[in-house]
Amino acid sequence: MSKNYRFETLQIHAGQKPDPVTKATGIPIYLSNAFTFDDADQAKNIFALEEGGYFYSRLSNPTVDALQQRMAALDGGVGAVAFASGTAAIMGLIMTVCETGDEIIAANNLYGGTIGSLSGTMADRKSTRLNS
């Protein structure tokens, strides 16, 4: 979407285009959990992340893509990632930034779910060490 639009317009229209078939301007909420493919090769490529497309809506779908594009446009960014919960966002960040063997120093008054994830999930994988 053009950078010339004002914030109010971006709030409504960023990350979407009118549907070419129905001409609807609103973003539909995709409740589908699976998507079709043109052929087996396309399915293979999408599952291998070698081609863009959707294969399971819990991982990505057109509704989430529109949300992410809209959030990036509102913040003037190049991309955004939406998570279903705060703990998912925190773990997504930690798993992206931290490498095997890293040490995480965390305040002991962090949200209990975060401490539990760090001291449980991450420690069980022996990927990080928590100091709190």
What are these regions (language model features)?
Residues 73-74, 92-100:
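Alpha-helix C-terminal capping segments
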Residues 1-51:
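N-terminal glycine-rich, Lys/His-bearing helix-loop that initiates the first secondary-structure elements
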Residues 28-29, 79-81, 102-103:
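Structural motif
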Residues 96-114:
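Conserved PLP-anchoring active-site segment centered on the Schiff-base-forming lysine
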Residues 128-132:
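Conserved small/polar residues in nucleotide/adenosyl-binding loops
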